Every structure is written in structure tokens, then in C-alpha cells.
């Protein structure tokens, strides 16, 4: 597919740095980018990081050096340096291509493109193939090759956006992205390659339909991943990530790939999301969140993260086992070095979760996001991963837990709230410092630094920040920490910025050199200390510092230019609304309008309530003044306890009147008054202070005058909104003061309290002098509103029993007053009930169905409709029928659920504990968790029983349990002895400890390993031998049979032997007599490839192939034998023999174990263990297979020995048998290459000869009579009417034909000869044809039809015709008429008949043959390409007829045809 690059040492960091620094920063040339890119770099897209010269193609780090975490080291050593094993053959080939063409050799500038270049092969790229990689050895690229490259890229993009795409083209694009240079990827991005890949991913559909297109999905996501090496592609990807319109979400399609059943695709999709989420700024974080919300829109997930976490848990627990990710049991499973991309996927997913939870600046939002992830399934995943002891998974998990717990503690303590307040205060202070110039420009005052030891200039501040980040990398050693502190303090006070920048460069280089260390060692710490102490001595000269400053300024300008490009690209993004700010402003205006509408509604409700409330307060104060005046002038004394009781009864009514309905009733009905001086009598005046909750609200009403007339209850209130808010926001009123108890009266009159009316107004006070008289109750407070907007009502208190009144002791006047008071109270009660029933009488569904939970409230404005029809009364619904529909269909329960107003409990941030204790070693428990993860949902007892009854259950576990040596290691089994059962004794004792107290895997280890420890290892070894023996023997058997068949073919194939004999004859011809040989060794046959001809163009193998192909074609049948040799050339004969012998030895050990080993003691086995029975039944079959394979091995070795001797290899037969097949195959490959090159060369030569002949024929043709006829056909004389009459009369006679032919011959003789250039004549002929096409059509057709009719009407006779194939007979026209014979043969030739040759007796045979050949040659060039097919034959027939017959007859025929027109 691609030629291999010249071998050489890999480039050094110095050469890469010099090469990178020489790149042009102009927009026309591409800037090379290394394979390592920082996914959290701070908006510096051109940052070059060549940290490792030997990095692979996929080395993309997940974090930058700025973070103080071990994830940077983890990325370099785990995530991408894991050996990926992909079963797909094409991907395996591209992995090899990636190793052959590493990224470092592809980071070179785009070659110069010129239109005209020289033919020097060193200055041009002439041999570019579509799939060949572009290398940096070519500095000049011709325009044609560059156009081919662009067309190839366009072709790939076309194939990508096809629906559905083709797997073959997607895989080819994947290969190109792995082997082509960076500027090739830049061209791919500029032609919308990234957008095309995202569209192709979208065109695959959604799950579960996409599940059938997993191979296509894998190729597309890999192509997107490999594009990240180009900076242009990264910018395009970042811009496209923000594309989220209805119906399409670019990142949403990638989020769907995270759910893919291919773990390799899910891994790369996670990396792509991680790449964006790690960028600074909330825009990319929001884009990733919208991608997960896209899953909810497509109904792939219930919540944003539930499907993702479910898939993540499936991978951890083994439910989702893929072809490219199934971890097989190996020897060192605890290191996880051979588990494909499983660890990559886990680490990348945990890193993506960390970035998602750390991106929001608001602590509450971060905690809410963490809570959502934990609820979606992250908690289960963490519990499972805590059992894993892989160092990379453990480090990533600990970082996640650490960040989660830190946010949880801050959320509970509320420390971040104070920080936010301080930031807000600081921002306001800075805002106040802004001053406006007279010209309107805003300037900001520069504040002095807080601390004097902090840097004051921006350069020093930048250096200080960098050094702080560097220092955090060396916190493991105290010595290096102290040294770096001193170094930092020195550089803060250093005035020379050049020295500081040079020191920073040295420290950064040291950090890059020490990246590979996992932990700080003693020698490393000492080296860092010495480096920090002697760093100033290693500073460069002033020239070096100036050079560094120049490079630094250039890099800053380049970064600025790239930032401007990013901003322009983002502003030109043609997705979504044209102006995002205008779109957001429109949404904000709509939200403000809705809020204003709600505010106006609340203000109107507040004003309405305020008006009623103040009116009631005024009425109450007036009534209170009246009652005080009456009581002061009253001569009778009331009983002290009655006023207190009446006051309490009024308070109860006050507590009940919390409904807005009662306020409406009181507005209309609460307008009664009390007449003073009704009763006469003497007594001690009593001043009663009624408890009022509104005294603090408005004290001006308490001093109002006493009026004997009713006072208006709705005075004009014109308070502002600000006063109303102050009124409502006042603190709650203080508790009422104590009631002044009057002196006891001589004749107390008990008065019954008012009847308890729910929601009604208070009853009017009785007349003075009557028991129970007192001030009216205060007005009700504002109605209480719950958190969700619905009102709650205070429960009605129990009514006190009405006290009995002895009316016999009352006077007549008192009885009248008591009766009047009762009437007034009854009227007030009736009015209150009417006001309440006005609304409660409206039918409601609550009368039929009681809500099961508190509901939210509908805030509408209630109106009293005027008399007459309206929208609610004209076409009134039947309430009973409508209510039945609601109840029968369950709509009320549905509404109860959807509009539930039950207060929600806020989530609580909890800490996750990673502490665990286990008797089982971490590595063993980790390995068992991986092996048993697909069956971990089964109970332990059932799982152990499954292993005992079905020994073949879970074959992967057999290999692990055989190699792990769990039962033979006392350190593993001794802690579990108290939990185990010993089956070696006849009466096994019960375990002393409870096995149920152990964890899942500990319990399994006890029941399956510890209980069977006396024969467990031999059992698992025998089961492993049984599971692998037949498969190994089958492979050996197939290979040995192929070797035997190939050996027989070599010895029996005659063509194979003669093939080499011809080669021997050619070699002896070349050699001198004393160098001749009767046989040659195959070991040295490769020398034929080095023997070239005199021109060094071809080898002997090329000429040998030409001889075999042309002179001995029957020897080509030996190719079937060579094909067999090619199939067995890769087999190692010694390895096959060793495999048979090893299988026999293992079988002997297995047989011994069954007879005399621990497996033979069945009485000491577990009672449910069926392993021995199954192995005993399998033993005879295994013995027979071993016997057959040993016999087959003997036959193979005998055949090989005879074949080696047959090929004249007599020395060291045991060594030669491993190589002679390879030598024969090498010879056949050389022969095949030479054969293919010969065929290609012959084909090119054939095309060249045909091209030369064609050119020579066109150039060498002379002018013919046909060209003259075509050119001069307009010059033919016009026929007279007599000739027309004669032609019409003689139409059916042969004599007329002869006359016409004679006239045609005369015209031929008078025709002009023309010039010597035939091509010019042909052009003129075509020009003459074009205007007269319509006029010439009918005459030619008339000539042909007339000729056919005349020939058919002539009597038949036989004519002998001689041809190359023999003698034939023809039946032309009349006897003796040779003209008819000639005409018919011409007609047959023009109509596609076979070529005929007339008899040699005919005197015109040679003339006719020559003229027919000339006509045939001229027929093709004379075809006008713009005319209809079939028009040429009639015109050629006319010309031939005029040439081959009498000229006069032909002229007459033409004239007659023209006259007919």
C-alpha cells in the first residue's frame, strides 16, 4: 500500500525544536503540531509541546502541566501507551503503518507548489500514489500532484457523507489520517472534513438502529479522534461542538457513541468529549451538557446521565463484553497490561466526570451535578471500582472522591458563600473606582498591590504564576521544597526579567526530563536541590537572553493571531440564530415582560387587600372610640369575667377569618354602629383596651372622633407601592397588652358568646349595659400563603357552649336590649353565610374527589359577571357529565401527581468513603472481580454449585485458577481456615466462623478454593488440559496434513521439476564450462534477483519469466504447487514437533494424576464435584487423539526428509527442513514480482505501438477520391428535366443503372485533387456536411433503397468466391452483369457482413479489393460526431457507387434524386 520510509535514527528534540522554529507563521502555510496536545491549555492553540520524541500517534494528554495532580503522569504511561489489540485486520495494518510513519516524521511544513518544475527527480514528487504517504524528503510539489491530492481529499469527503457510507472508504480515510502529514489534515479540515464526519455520524441514526452499524461508527469516530493532531482540525471541531439546533446536535451524536457496544468506539468518544470539557470557559461545558440532554430528547435516556452511567456500570460488571475488549485471564493480571482498552475507557470516563463536576463556578451547581451523577449510577460504579487495585484506576478514582468530598464539606460549611460575598464587594468597590472623563471615556484607577512582596509588573506576575505551578510539582521532598522557596523569593525581587525568563526555561526543561518518574526518589531530590541552588550559575549570556526574548515575542504575536482567527471563526459559525446576542436579548425581553405581568398582578392584589384592610382598621377604631365613650358614661358595672370571655370569643372569630371571601363579605356587610347613651344608670366607668394586631401599623386611626352615624368602611386610599411594601414588610406585631379588668357589677348579666361562623365577619356588639358587651374584634390579618402559592386555612376552633341566661332576673328594658342584640347578631350571621355561600355554592370537583396531596394554586382575577349571557353561562356544560369524565379517566389523580405542592427535600451532599478491609489480598480480589464480573449477580452458593456440577462453566476462569496457584499459597488460605470445611475426613466438621459474614468474593474463595485446597490445583490443571488439548491438536493436525500434501505435490509434479531444469539450463549457458552444474542448492537461489542485464534495467528473473511464458507455457501449471508452498512457508516444523511431544507429556501427567494423584481420591472430594467423572469419561478419547497425532507426526517427518533429499539438500536435514519451504517461497515471490512487472511493461509497450501506428496512419494517409466527392458534392451539375424524365422512365431497368454509374465515373475524373494534408481535407469535409444534412438525407437513402431493389429483382446465378477459409458460392443478379455483383458485395461490406473476396477469374478483383480497403480506412475519420448514428453509411454508399461504377449513370442517379427534392 505504501512504500516504507528509509530507516534511520529518530529525530532528536534539538532537531525538532529547530525545525519547528523555522516554520512560517503566515496564514498561507500550515504550522505543524506535535502529537501531544494539552486538553486544558488556556486558549493558546499554537502551544508546541514536544515532550517525548518517541510518542505514538494517539498520545493526547488529558490534562496540562499546570494541574497539581498525578493525572499527567497517568496519561503518558497508561491511557495511550497501552498496547491496543484490535481484532480487525485493517486496523492492525494501520497500526503497523502508524509505527512506520510516526507523527514526528510527519510534522513538516507544506511543500512549495509550483506550476513549472524541472525534470530533476530530486526536486519533484512524480511518483505520488493515491494511498502513498507524503514525506518530508520532497520540498517542491508540482501543481498537478497537488490537485490530485485535493481531489483525493474531496473524494473521501464525498464518500463520507454518503447515506449509508461505505466501510471500505471509511477505513481508507482512517489509514490516510494515520500516515499523512499534518498539512494534509489541515487541507482536509478546510474542506469541511470535520463537519462531514459529524454529519456521517448523525446519518447512522439513533440506537437501537445504530447498533447494526457498529463497524461504520467505529471507523468514523476513529477518524475524528485522529484528526485532533491537526490544530486546524481542533479549531473546526471546537466550533462545530457548539452546533445545537432542533433536530441535530453535533456532540449529541458523539454522546450516543459513548453508549456504543464497541468499547473502542466508546473510549474514543469519551476522549473527544473530554477534550472539549477540559477547555477553559463554560461554553464547552454547556455544549457537553447539551449533548447528554440530547440523549433525553431522543428517548435514549431517562435523565441526562442515566444511560451513560448504566453503560459505564455494564462495562465494569462485565455485562457488556465486546469482541475487542474481553479481558482474558493472564499470568500478571494485577498489572492490567493486556486488557485492551478497558483501563483507557475507565480512566477517561472518570476524568470526564471530574471535568464536568469541576467546570461550573457556582458551588451549589457543582454539588447538584455531583448529586445527579451519583443518583444516575455513579455511586454503584464507585463501589465496584473500589475493589479494583490497578494503580491508574485507583489514582483516578481517588482524585474524583477527593474533589467530591471537598465540595461536600464546603457546601455544608458554607465557606464559599462568604468568598462569593467578598468577591462581589470587591467588584463593587472596583466599579466605584471608575471615573468618567469629560469626553465620555471610562477609565479605571489602578489599585496598589495588597502585599509588598508580590510582583508589581505584569511580567513578574506571569513569572510568579509559572514558578508557583512548578513548585507544586515537587511537594514530595522537603529539601527541594525549601530550595525552591528560596529560589522563588529571589526571583520575585530580581529586577532583570531576562534572567527570570531564562531560569523559567531551564526549570521547565528539567520538569520535562523528569516526567517519567512515578515518585520522587532520593537521588532525584538531591539533584533538584543542587539544581535550585546553582541555577543562577547556569544562566545564559545577554545575546542568548535577547534571542530568547525575540522568540518569545514572536510566539506571543503568533498566539494573538491565532486567537483572532478563533474569534473570527466563532463569529462566522452559520448554525443556529444569526446573532446569538440578539436571540438572547429577545428571550430576556420576553422573560422580563412575563415578570412585569406577574408583578402587576401581585401589585393589584396587594392594593386591593390593602384598601380593604385599611377600611376595616378605620371602622374598628371608630367603633372602639364609640364603645369607650359609652363605657365611660355607663353607670352600671359589668361582671369582670364576661369581658374577658367576650374578648376571647372575638379573638377566635379573628383567627377564623383568614379567607379572602370573609374580607369581601365584611366590605359590604360590616357597617353597623352603636348608639351612645341608650342605657341609663350609674356605675364605675371601665376602660377596656382591646388587643389589636394593627396598632403598630397605623396609629392615626386610634384618635378618630366618635360619630353617632355609620362611618364609611371603604375610604379613599392613595398610598404608593413603596408605602404598601413597607406596610407588608414590617415585623410581626407585638403580643397584645393585658386587659384591664373592671370592678364587679352588682347584677352581672350573662350574655351568650357569638356563634362560631367559619370565615364570617364578627357580630355587632350588644348595647351597653348588657352582659357580653365589649369592643368589636380586630380585622383579620392577610391570608397566609404557602411556599408553592396555595393558601392554607387555619382550622376552626371548637365553639364554646352557650351559657344559660336567667331571663327572669332581667328587667323589661334589658330584655328588649338583649332581643335587639340577638336580632343584630342573627342578621350579621345571615349576611356572612350568604357571602360565603356565594362562592362555596359553585360546584367543584373537590366535592366529588378529595385531593390526595396539597396542590398548587391557580392565580386568576375573580370577577362578578353582570346579568345576562356570557361565555361561562350561555353554553353551560353539564357538570355531572364532565365530572364523570374526569373521575372515570383518572384525570384527577394525574393532576394531583403533576401539580403536587408537597415541599421538596433538598439533597444532602454526602461524603464517599474509600476505606475497606478484607482478608483476601487486593490483587486476588481484583482478579476474581474481573473473572467473575459477568456472573457476579448470582448468589455465591449457586455460583459455586455451578462450578462444581459443570466444570466447563466460564472457561476463562479455568485458565486463571490454574495459573494463579491460589490453593497452594498458604498466605492466601490460612486466614480462611476457620470459615472452611475439611472434606478429607469422613465426618467433616462445621466451620468455627460464620462464612456469611464475609464479602462476596471472600465467601466464594472459601467455598470454592479453600474447601477444595487439597486437590484444587490438580483439578484445575486437568480441566485446563481438557479444555485446550483438542484445539491445539486440531491446529497441529491441519498443519501437518498441509505439509504432507505439499511434499507430495513437490515430488509428483512434473512441471515443477522441469521449471527448475529450464532455469538450470539457462544458468549453465551463462557460465563457463568449468562452472557448469548438474544441480543447484535452493538456499542460494535469491542470487537470481541480483543478476541484472547490461543496462541494469531488468534481472535474469524477468527474462526467465518471458522464456517460460512464450516458449514453455505448459510449465506455468507449476503455480499450483508454488501456492501450496506459499501456504506452508510460515510453519515452523520444529515447533510443530515440539507441540506434539509436549501434548504427549502433558497427557502422561494427566493420566498419572487420574490414577495415582489427588484426583484419584474421590472419597476426599466435595460431594457435589463432578470433575473426576467427566475427566474419566474423556480419557479414552484423548488417548486415541494422541495416538493419531503421533503417527501423523512420524509420517510428516518421513515425507519431509524425502522431499529435502529430492531437492538436493543433503547436509543437516533437521535444520534444512525448517527453511527450505521459505526459500522456495522467496523464489516464487521474486518470480511473481518479475512476472507482474513484465506484464505491466508489455502492456505499456503494446499501447505505445498502437499509438504510434495510429499516429503514423493518420499522418501518412493521402488524399482519396472520397474526400474530393465530399468536398465537391455541391459542385455537381444540375440535371435537366429530360434527364429526370429519362430516370423516371428507366427506373426499373438495369441499363439506367449503368448510365448513372458512367456519369458518376465522369464526375470522378473531373474532380479536384486537393492538397496533401488529409486531416485538413477531413475538416473541410465535415464542414461541408453540417449545413446540408437535412437536404442530403433523402437522396442517399433513395440511392441505397433503389440499389437494394434492383439487386433483388435480378435472376439468380451462382458465382464461385474464394476466401481464406475456403471456397464458397454466391448468388448475385443477372447473368454476365458484373456491375451488380460488385454492387452487392459493396452493400454487404457496408452492412457489416464478413469480408468477401471475388474469384480470381474476375479481372476487376484487385481493383475492387484496393478500393474497398481505402473506403474502410476513410470511413472512421469521416464520421461527424455531432450527427446521428447511421447517417454515414448512406453517404459512403453513394460515394462508393459513384466511384466503382460508370460515372454517367451515377451522375444521372444523383441528378434524379436532386430533382425529386
Curated annotation (Swiss-Prot):
Name the record gives this protein: Formin-3
Origin organism lineage: Eukaryota, Fungi, Dikarya, Ascomycota, Taphrinomycotina
Broad class of the protein's primary localization: cytoplasm
Keyword Cytoplasm tagged: yes
Paired cysteines (S-S): none
Biological-process GO terms, alphabetical: actin cytoskeleton organization; actin filament bundle assembly; actin filament bundle organization; establishment or maintenance of bipolar cell polarity; mitotic actomyosin contractile ring assembly; protein localization to mitotic actomyosin contractile ring; regulation of cell shape
Stretches the record annotates as Disordered: 1-67, 431-457, 683-811, 1268-1337, 1416-1461
Organism field: Schizosaccharomyces pombe (strain 972 / ATCC 24843) (Fission yeast)
SUPFAM superfamilies, per the entry: ARM repeat, Formin homology 2 domain (FH2 domain)
Protein purpose: Involved in controlling polarized cell growth. Required for interphase actin cable formation and microtubule organization.
PROSITE patterns named among the record's database cross-references: FH2, GBD_FH3
Amino acid at each position: 500500500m505504501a512504500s516504507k520510509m528509509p530507516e534511520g535514527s529518530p529525530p532528536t528534540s534539538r532537531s525538532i525544536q529547530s525545525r519547528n522554529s523555522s516554520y512560517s507563521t503566515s496564514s498561507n502555510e500550515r504550522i505543524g503540531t506535535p502529537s501531544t496536545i494539552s486538553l486544558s491549555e488556556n486558549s493558546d492553540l499554537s502551544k508546541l509541546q514536544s515532550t517525548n520524541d518517541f510518542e505514538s500517534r494517539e498520545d493526547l494528554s488529558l490534562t496540562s502541566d499546570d494541574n497539581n495532580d498525578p493525572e499527567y503522569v497517568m496519561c503518558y504511561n497508561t491511557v495511550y501507551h497501552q498496547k491496543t489489540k484490535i481484532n480487525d485486520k485493517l486496523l492492525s495494518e494501520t497500526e503497523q503503518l502508524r509505527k512506520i510513519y510516526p507523527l514526528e516524521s510527519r510534522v513538516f511544513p507544506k511543500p512549495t507548489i509550483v506550476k513549472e518544475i524541472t525534470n530533476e527527480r530530486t526536486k519533484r514528487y512524480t511518483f505520488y500514489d493515491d494511498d502513498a504517504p507524503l514525506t518530508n524528503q520532497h520540498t517542491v510539489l508540482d501543481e498537478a500532484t497537488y490537485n490530485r491530492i485535493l481531489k483525493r481529499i474531496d473524494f473521501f469527503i464525498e464518500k463520507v457523507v454518503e447515506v449509508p457510507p461505505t466501510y471500505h472508504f471509511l477505513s481508507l480515510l482512517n489509514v490516510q489520517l494515520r500516515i499523512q502529514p499534518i498539512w494534509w489534515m489541515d487541507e482536509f479540515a478546510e474542506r469541511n472534513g470535520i463537519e462531514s464526519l459529524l454529519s456521517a455520524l448523525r446519518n447512522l441514526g439513533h440506537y437501537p438502529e445504530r447498533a447494526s452499524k457498529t463497524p461504520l461508527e467505529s471507523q468514523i469516530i476513529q477518524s475524528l479522534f485522529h484528526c485532533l493532531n491537526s490544530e486546524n482540525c481542533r479549531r473546526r471541531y471546537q466550533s462545530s461542538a457548539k452546533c445545537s439546533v432542533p433536530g441535530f446536535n453535533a456532540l449529541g451524536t458523539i454522546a450516543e457513541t459513548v453508549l456504543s457496544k464497541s468499547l473502542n468506539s466508546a473510549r474514543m468518544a469519551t476522549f473527544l468529549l473530554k477534550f472539549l470539557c477540559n477547555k477553559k470557559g463554560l461554553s464547552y461545558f454547556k455544549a457537553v451538557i447539551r449533548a447528554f440532554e440530547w440523549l433525553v430528547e431522543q428517548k435514549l435516556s431517562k435523565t441526562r446521565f442515566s444511560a451513560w452511567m448504566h453503560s459505564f456500570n455494564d462495562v465494569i460488571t462485565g455485562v457488556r463484553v465486546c469482541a475487542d475488549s474481553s479481558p482474558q485471564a493472564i499470568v500478571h493480571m494485577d498489572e492490567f497490561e493486556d486488557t485492551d482498552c478497558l483501563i483507557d475507557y475507565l480512566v477517561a470516563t472518570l476524568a470526564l466526570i471530574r471535568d464536568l463536576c469541576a467546570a461550573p463556578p457556582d458551588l451549589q451547581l457543582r454539588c447538584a451535578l455531583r448529586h445527579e451523577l451519583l443518583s444516575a449510577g455513579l455511586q454503584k460504579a464507585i463501589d465496584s471500582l473500589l475493589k479494583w487495585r490497578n494503580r491508574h484506576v485507583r489514582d483516578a478514582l481517588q482524585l474524583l472522591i477527593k474533589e467530591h468530598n471537598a465540595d461536600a464539606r464546603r457546601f455544608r460549611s458554607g465557606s464559599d458563600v462568604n468568598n462569593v460575598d467578598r468577591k462581589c464587594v470587591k467588584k463593587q468597590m472596583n466599579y466605584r473606582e471608575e471615573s468618567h472623563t469629560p469626553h465620555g471615556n471610562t477609565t479605571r484607577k489602578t489599585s496598589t498591590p495588597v502585599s509588598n512582596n508580590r510582583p508589581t509588573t505584569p511580567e513578574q506576575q506571569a513569572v510568579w504564576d509559572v514558578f508557583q505551578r512548578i513548585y507544586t510539582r515537587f511537594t514530595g521532598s522537603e529539601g527541594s521544597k525549601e530550595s525552591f522557596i528560596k529560589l522563588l523569593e529571589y526571583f520575585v525581587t530580581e529586577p532583570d526579567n531576562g534572567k527570570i525568563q531564562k531560569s523559567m526555561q531551564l526549570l521547565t526543561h528539567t520538569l520535562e526530563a523528569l516526567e517519567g518518574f512515578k515518585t520522587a526518589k532520593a537521588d532525584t531530590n538531591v539533584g533538584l536541590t543542587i539544581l535550585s541552588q546553582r541555577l543562577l550559575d547556569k544562566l545564559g549570556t545577554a545575546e542568548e537572553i535577547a534571542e530568547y526574548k525575540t522568540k518569545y515575542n514572536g510566539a506571543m504575536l503568533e498566539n494573538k493571531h491565532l486567537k483572532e482567527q478563533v474569534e473570527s471563526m466563532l463569529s462566522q459559525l452559520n448554525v443556529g440564530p444569526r446573532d446569538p446576542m440578539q436571540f438572547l436579548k429577545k428571550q430576556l425581553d420576553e422573560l422580563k415582560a412575563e415578570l412585569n405581568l406577574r408583578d402587576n398582578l401581585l401589585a393589584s392584589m396587594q392594593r386591593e387587600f390593602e384598601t380593604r384592610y385599611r377600611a376595616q382598621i378605620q371602622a374598628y377604631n371608630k367603633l372602639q372610640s364609640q364603645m369607650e365613650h359609652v363605657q365611660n358614661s355607663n353607670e352600671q358595672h359589668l361582671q369582670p369575667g364576661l369581658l374577658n370571655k367576650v374578648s376571647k370569643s372575638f379573638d377566635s372569630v379573628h383567627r377564623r377569618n383568614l379567607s379572602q371571601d370573609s374580607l369581601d363579605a365584611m366590605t359590604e356587610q360590616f357597617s353597623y354602629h352603636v348608639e351612645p347613651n341608650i342605657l341609663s344608670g350609674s356605675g364605675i366607668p371601665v376602660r377596656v383596651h382591646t388587643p389589636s394586631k394593627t396598632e403598630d401599623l397605623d396609629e392615626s386611626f386610634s384618635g378618630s372622633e366618635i360619630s353617632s352615624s355609620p362611618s364609611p368602611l371603604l375610604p379613599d386610599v392613595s398610598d404608593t407601592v413603596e408605602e404598601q411594601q413597607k406596610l407588608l414588610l414590617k415585623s410581626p406585631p407585638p403580643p397584645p397588652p393585658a386587659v384591664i379588668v373592671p370592678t364587679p357589677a352588682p347584677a352581672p348579666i350573662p350574655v351568650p358568646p357569638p356563634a362560631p361562623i367559619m370565615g364570617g365577619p364578627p357580630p355587632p356588639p350588644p348595647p351597653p349595659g348588657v352582659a357580653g358587651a365589649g369592643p368589636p374584634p380586630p380585622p383579620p390579618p392577610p391570608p397566609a400563603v404557602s411556599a408553592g402559592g396555595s393558601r392554607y386555612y387555619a382550622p376552626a376552633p371548637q365553639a364554646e357552649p352557650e351559657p344559660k341566661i336567667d331571663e327572669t332576673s332581667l328587667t323589661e328594658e334589658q330584655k328588649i336590649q338583649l332581643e335587639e342584640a340577638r336580632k343584630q347578631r342573627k342578621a350579621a350571621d345571615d349576611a356572612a353565610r350568604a357571602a360565603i355561600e356565594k362562592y362555596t355554592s359553585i360546584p367543584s370537583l373537590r366535592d366529588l374527589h378529595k385531593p390526595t396531596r396539597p396542590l398548587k394554586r391557580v392565580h386568576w382575577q375573580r370577577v362578578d359577571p353582570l346579568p345576562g349571557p356570557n361565555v361561562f353561562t350561555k353554553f353551560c356544560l353539564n357538570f355531572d357529565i364532565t365530572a364523570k369524565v374526569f373521575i372515570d379517566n383518572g384525570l384527577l389523580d394525574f393532576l394531583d401527581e403533576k401539580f403536587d405542592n408537597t415541599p421538596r427535600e433538598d439533597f444532602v451532599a454526602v461524603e464517599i468513603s474509600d476505606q475497606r478491609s478484607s482478608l483476601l489480598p487486593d490483587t486476588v480480589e481484583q482478579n476474581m472481580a474481573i473473572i467473575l464480573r459477568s456472573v457476579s449477580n448470582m448468589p455465591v452458593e449457586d455460583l459455586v454449585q455451578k462450578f462444581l456440577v459443570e466444570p466447563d462453566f466460564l472457561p476463562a476462569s479455568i485458565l486463571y485458577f490454574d495459573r494463579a496457584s491460589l490453593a497452594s499459597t498458604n498466605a492466601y488460605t490460612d486466614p480462611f481456615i476457620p470459615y472452611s470445611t475439611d472434606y478429607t475426613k469422613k465426618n467433616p466438621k462445621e466451620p468455627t466462623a460464620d462464612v456469611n459474614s464475609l464479602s462476596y468474593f471472600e465467601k466464594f474463595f472459601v467455598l470454592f478454593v479453600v474447601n477444595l485446597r487439597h486437590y484444587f490445583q490438580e483439578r484445575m490443571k486437568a480441566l485446563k488440559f481438557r479444555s485446550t488439548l483438542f484445539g491445539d491438536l486440531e491446529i497441529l493436525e491441519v498443519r501437518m496434513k498441509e505439509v504432507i500434501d505439499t511434499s507430495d505435490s513437490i515430488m509428483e509434479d512434473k512441471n515443477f521439476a522441469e521449471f527448475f531444469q529450464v532455469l538450470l539450463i539457462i544458468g549453465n549457458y551463462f557460465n563457463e564450462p568449468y562452472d557448469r552444474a548438474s544441480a543447484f542448492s535452493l538456499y542460494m537461489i535469491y542470487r537470481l534477483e541480483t543478476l541484472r542485464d547490461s543496462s541494469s534495467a531488468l534481472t535474469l528473473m524477468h527474462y526467465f519469466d518471458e522464456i517460460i511464458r512464450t516458449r514453455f507455457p505448459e510449465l506455468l501449471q507449476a503455480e499450483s504447487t508454488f501456492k501450496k508452498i506459499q501456504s506452508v512457508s510460515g510453519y515452523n516444523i520444529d515447533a510443530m514437533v515440539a507441540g506434539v511431544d509436549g501434548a504427549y507429556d502433558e497427557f502422561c501427567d494427566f493420566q498419572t494424576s487420574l490414577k495415582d494423584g489427588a484426583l484419584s481420591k474421590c472419597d476426599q472430594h466435595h460431594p457435589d464435584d463432578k470433575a473426576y467423572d467427566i475427566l474419566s469419561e474423556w480419557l479414552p478419547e484423548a488417548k486415541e487423539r494422541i495416538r493419531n497425532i503421533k503417527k501423523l507426526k512420524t509420517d510428516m517427518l518421513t515425507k519431509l526428509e524425502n522431499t529435502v533429499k529430492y531437492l538436493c539438500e543433503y547436509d543437516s536435514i533437521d535444520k534444512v527442513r525448517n527453511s527450505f519451504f521459505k526459500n522456495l517461497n522467496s523464489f516464487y515471490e521474486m518470480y511473481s514480482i518479475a512476472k507482474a512487472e513484465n506484464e505491466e511493461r508489455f502492456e505499456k509497450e503494446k499501447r505505445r505501438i498502437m499509438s504510434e501506428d495510429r499516429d503514423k496512419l493518420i499522418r501518412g494517409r493521402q488524399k482519396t477520391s472520397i474526400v474530393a466527392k465530399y468536398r465537391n458534392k455541391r459542385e455537381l451539375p444540375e440535371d435537366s428535366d429530360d434527364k429526370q424524365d429519362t430516370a423516371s422512365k428507366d427506373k426499373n431497368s438495369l441499363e439506367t443503372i449503368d448510365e448513372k454509374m458512367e456519369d458518376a465515373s465522369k464526375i470522378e475524373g473531373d474532380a479536384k485533387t486537393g492538397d496533401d494534408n488529409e486531416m485538413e481535407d477531413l475538416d473541410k469535409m465535415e464542414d461541408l456536411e453540417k449545413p446540408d444534412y437535412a437536404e442530403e438525407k433523402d437522396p442517399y437513402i433513395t440511392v441505397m433503397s433503389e440499389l437494394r431493389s434492383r439487386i433483388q429483382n435480378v435472376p439468380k446465378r451462382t458465382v464461385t468466391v474464394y476466401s481464406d477459409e475456403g471456397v464458397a458460392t454466391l448468388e448475385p443478379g443477372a447473368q454476365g452483369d458484373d456491375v451488380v455483383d460488385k454492387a452487392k458485395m459493396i452493400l454487404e461490406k457496408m452492412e457489416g457482413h464478413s469480408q468477401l473476396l471475388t474469384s480470381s477469374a474476375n479481372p476487376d478483383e484487385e481493383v475492387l479489393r484496393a478500393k474497398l480497403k481505402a473506403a474502410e480506412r476513410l470511413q472512421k475519420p469521416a464520421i461527424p460526431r455531432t450527427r446521428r448514428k447511421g447517417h454515414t453509411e448512406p453517404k459512403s454508399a453513394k460515394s462508393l457507387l459513384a466511384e466503382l461504377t460508370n460515372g454517367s449513370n451515377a451522375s444521372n442517379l444523383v441528378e434524379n434524386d436532386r430533382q425529386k427534392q
